[in-house]
Amino acid sequence: MGPVLDWSANFAHSLHRCAVRDLSHIGWWLVALSLAAAEPGGGGYRAEIQKWREGYEADLKKDNGWLTLAGLFWLKEGNNTFGTSAENDIVLPKGSAPGQAGAFLFHDGKTRLRLKDGVRALVNGDPLRTKSPAEIPLNPDTTGKPDRITLGRLSMIVIQRSTRFGIRLWDNNSAVRRDFPGSQWFPIHEMFRVTAQFTSYAQPKMIPILNVLGDTEQNPSPGFAAFKLEGKTCRLEPLLEGDHLFFILKDLTSGKETYAAGRFLYTTMPKDGKLILDFNKAENPPCAFTPFATCPLPPKQNHLPVAVTAGDRKPAHGTASH
């Protein structure tokens, strides 16, 4: 989570424009997935899954992780003032910043930052003072390298979703982070580690992906995974995630034992037409923890006809729901 896209090679720009998901956690996940996983059939496999889960939760709880997300503010044309005063367009958490800290100047899809005199901030880790220069252009997340503003314990970036631009806010003093009870997991069952047959498309197939904002974007899928689970024939279409695959899926537990909007699963690339799908690593999307994420929803073809009682359960009381 914590993610959170950041998309790979030739698909990077098209998927950034789609901006269907958030990938702040992806660095940790790619490292974890690249480690040699223990083969199932003993304590080594269970230990590997447990270690993966510990890393997943640590990533959720880190500074500027998903549990610290504290706001999403859509920009209007012109000045968008920010600070802790209620008079601002973007109201920051009480006690976190000056009452009038500055403004985001938004015009024709471009965003610039202007600070009030005397306000100290960092942009990409470098100190920024007013009048040096007075206005700073900001790259949105769809460029793959968003400019990050740090204001005390807060940080902000510009995000783009379809035709909308907004300010994403993190607060490292977030009560959600402080009170997080930990993830709820199903017991580890090796039957949910399956070998799938992967069929590559001659050319990437564009599939529509709806997100929680109601936006639908076309995204390329490299192929599909076919497998049997509990006697049922199943099929999933992934998106590309760097040199890995990203599955957005639902199953018969969704809305009951697991998060209603579905779960995510990441895998390495197929080898010799085979792909390992380990549903013990199925995880909740960021929207399970915060209303300020912009997660994608599973396409209809990724609704499994079985109950996958493995991986992340429904979040504990007090977390977000969609």
Question: Model-found features: residue ranges?
Answer:
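Flexible, glycine-rich surface segments
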Residues: Q197-T253, Y259
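Extended, aromatic/histidine-rich regions of cofactor-dependent oxidoreductases associated
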Residues: G182-W185, L252-K256, Y266-T268, K274-I276, ...
